Amino acid sequence: MADTNVNGGTQQATGKLKSVESLDQTNEMERGLSNRHVQFIAIGGTIGTGLFLGSGKSISLTGPSIIFVYILVGVIMFFLMRAIGEMMYRDPSQHTFINFITRYLGNGWGHFAGWTYWAALVLLGMTEITAVSTYFITFFDTFGIDLTHWKWLIELCFLVSLVSINLIAVKVFGEVEFWFSMIKITLICAMIATAVVMIVIGYHYPAVQIHGVDHVSPAGHAGFDNLFADFSFAPNGWMAFLMSFQMVFFAYEMIEFVGVTVSETKNPRKVLPKAINEIIVRVLIFYVGALVAIMCIVPWTSFKPNKDGSFASPFIMMFQYAGLNWASALVFFVVINAASSALNSLLYSAGRHLYQLSEVSPNPMLNKLGKVSDRKVPARAILVSAALILLSPIVNAIPGVSGAFVLFSSASSAVFLFIYILTLLAHRRYRRSADFIADGFVMPAWKVLNTVAIVFFVFIYLTLFLADDTRNSAIAGLVWLVGFGGFSMLRERYRSRDLKAALEHKE
């Protein structure tokens, strides 16, 4: 698993590892991201709002077994990242891992994956900007300040601020993401430390009205026995247990973001392997550690839905049990930070993907977006992506259109599974190609691990059909795969035929 030959140049029987400098001859971006930036970007990509707000529902579905689900899904995502990392290690000048789908599966699948991934990023950005404003309003509501009527202005201010960060320089983006990640890490570590103290002193807490819960939570105590009380591997049945996999998967979504930063990272062949190999450690600390701490304080049987079907944040529950009545404001401040980080990363990634698509497009209009600014960032592609994200409040306000938007937004999460599967298939082709570098950042037991990951992602997609709130998304995703995927393949077939005819005519 250790990477060797960091500086490149060693000839292998199956390929030659070129130096980063020689590969960068066509890379117009600036390598402004340091090791510190990338490591914290990787952490930020692992920790999303799902951990802070959504884990309550997943705990209620499976109880302590959710820890097993988080570990299993985390390991599979690690396999995916090792596959991406191996290909990126060979060619760190690529702006996106999607390029490897084009290289090893053909232009048809590359066209499908590239535009699908970019569209999914924009749709996720539209939902994320809505979420940021909602969390911002909730945060101030804890102080009795109503900002509901200023929702559109909040969204505009956040988006303008984050776009400005992305336009200044990649180093500035990296620095902002560093601090976003630091805030998330601090809250999780503070929560785990608080739980440890409560367990050690045998803390007992009274019945309390938790913010965001429409019923009084019962009195209890802190201890490891809460973790195993009334234990059942599938307390709500196997159907609920299977549904928890999709929820956990979406919590890990965008973990691949660190792979998009490679073309702008200093010493990528040294930094990338470290960032990827530490994914397992991050999963154990920030997900497993946090969930164990929560369930040692709050019995898993206490996670019950409100009348409207929503769940309170486990972090808010735990801190309020500890007597911190301002816990709600604290957690929502960090959630605003986490959502802002996600939106910031989506802008970065969407800009790079649109830049890459525009650069290779035969369309002259799109070619204009495939340019970098004087600050070495794809400014035009970022601005176009941001402009589409800014349509979110308008789309949400139009009757009929808003319902379709919700469907497509949720379907965009589902199509990430298609992208992941195509990436793994591209990795299989890479390993069998003359491009393979035996002394690179090689994925061990790749035939087994790659296959396991593909099968697992297919399984996750099938679980989307189990729940009413994800079934339509799964169907919409399949329609997109057949429709746009078929169009992309036919487009490439006709382009290849026309090119062949032109060459024959020239001869």
Map each language-model feature to its residues:
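Membrane-helix boundary/coupling elements in multi-pass transport proteins
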Residues: 93, 116-133, 247, 252-265, ...
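Membrane-interface loop-to-helix entry segments
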Residues: 150-218, 249-253, 276-280, 409, ...
